[in-house]
Swiss-Prot record:
The gene is ycf48. Coiled coil: none annotated. It is a lipid-anchor. Keywords: Lipoprotein, Membrane, Palmitate, Photosynthesis, Photosystem II, Signal, Thylakoid. Part of early PSII assembly complexes which includes D1 (psbA) and PsbI; not found in mature PSII. Binds to the lumenal side of PSII complexes. Interacts with YidC. GO terms for biological process: photosynthesis. This is Photosystem II assembly lipoprotein Ycf48. A lipid is attached at C24 (S-diacylglycerol cysteine). The lineage of its organism: Bacteria, Bacillati, Cyanobacteriota, Cyanophyceae, Synechococcales.
Length: 331
């Protein structure tokens, strides 16, 4: 009798968990018939972290272990580039951006590079030793103008090619694990432990702190194409922000698949499809706003953790993996 009771209780627990998570939980998904991605292997051990282009054909990829690669054919092929940096420092080049021929690279520890000739040469900018944190995200805003955010949420702007910087916030947000900038200049950051997130709108003097919406720790957050927000939490859960101005209002969790691997990033492609990437070749796509999902065949066949999507406008996009693995958007 006792085994029967235990089985019944286990069934009730499973049903309760399924409904408590607010959606259908599955351990398998159908495979998409085709993929808009092309797999590339760069032949390196470093992790690619960001991509930016000066025009339709010419661009750069940066990453860990001082990685700099250049393309002149829209990203079909890449060649390693050497930048004059101290040999005894193993820089992590984490962010790159261009405005025409003017480019910026942010790296750790304490590195900021500037170019005014489409990346043919780079000069190192001196950063104040009192700068809170390390450079994390650089955004080119116009001629000689850029915005720099650090890994503790300090935000600065320069309008003289990086010679001087003006603080945008009075106090930093604290150590972050993820930080994103919206097209309208808003920022969202996830705390290093994932137990809360912070938002900053242009004109505010301080970051606004918000508690996480469930017991699941936050992994990453960002902005949807319409300016509303998305959230990835531990436990392979996705959430959406239905009211862009209300940072406390979130959808029930969406759990596309429970395969033991979490998600690391989300993005929207030019057709409005949602992509979610994560561990061990996890690359999923939804064409109906997150209700139904499919596995991408190219991503599934790529033995890598997909850490970030970079959609650059038009039909140019990349899914960045680890140890030189990237996917290029071919539509």
């Amino acid at each position: 009798m006792i085994p029967v009771i235990r089985s019944f209780l286990s069934l009730l627990l499973c049903v309760g968990l399924t409904f408590g998570l607010g959606g259908c939980v599955t351990t398998s998904l159908p495979m998409a018939a085709a993929s808009p991605w092309n797999s590339q292997k760069l032949g390196i051990e470093s992790n690619p972290l960001d991509v930016a282009f000066t025009n339709e054909s010419h661009g750069f990829l940066v990453g860990s272990n001082r990685l700099v690669m250049e393309t002149s054919d829209g990203g079909e092929t890449w060649e390693e580039r050497e930048i004059d940096l101290p040999a005894d420092e193993n820089f992590r080049l984490i962010s790159i951006d261009f405005n025409g021929d003017e480019g910026w690279i942010a790296g750790q520890p304490g590195l900021l590079l500037h170019s005014d000739d489409a990346g043919q040469s780079w000069s190192r900018l001196l950063l104040d030793t009192k700068l809170p944190g390390d450079p994390y995200l650089i955004t080119a805003l116009g001629s000689k103008k850029a915005e720099l955010a650090t890994n503790v949420g300090a935000i600065y702007q320069s309008s003289d090619a990086g010679k001087s910087w003006q603080a945008e916030v009075v106090d930093a947000a604290g150590s972050v694990r993820d930080l994103r900038r919206g097209d309208d200049g808003r920022y969202v950051s996830v705390s290093s432990l994932g137990n809360f997130f912070s938002t900053w709108d242009p004109g505010q003097s301080n970051w606004q702190v918000h508690q996480r919406v469930s017991s699941q720790r936050l992994q990453s957050m960002g902005y949807q194409p319409d300016g509303q927000m998305w959230m990835v939490t531990r436990g392979a859960q996705l959430r959406f922000n239905p009211e862009g101005g209300d940072y406390e209002e979130w959808s029930k969790p969406v759990i596309p698949i429970t395969n033991g691997y979490g998600y690391l990033d989300m993005a929207w492609d030019p057709q409005g499809n949602i992509w979610a990437g994560g561990g061990n070749g996890t690359l999923l796509v939804s064409s109906d706003g997150g209700k139904e999902w499919e596995k991408d065949p190219v991503g599934t066949a790529t033995p890598s953790n997909f850490t970030r999507f970079v959609f650059l406008g038009g039909n140019k996009a990349f899914a960045l993996g680890e140890r030189g693995a990237i996917l290029r958007w071919v539509g």
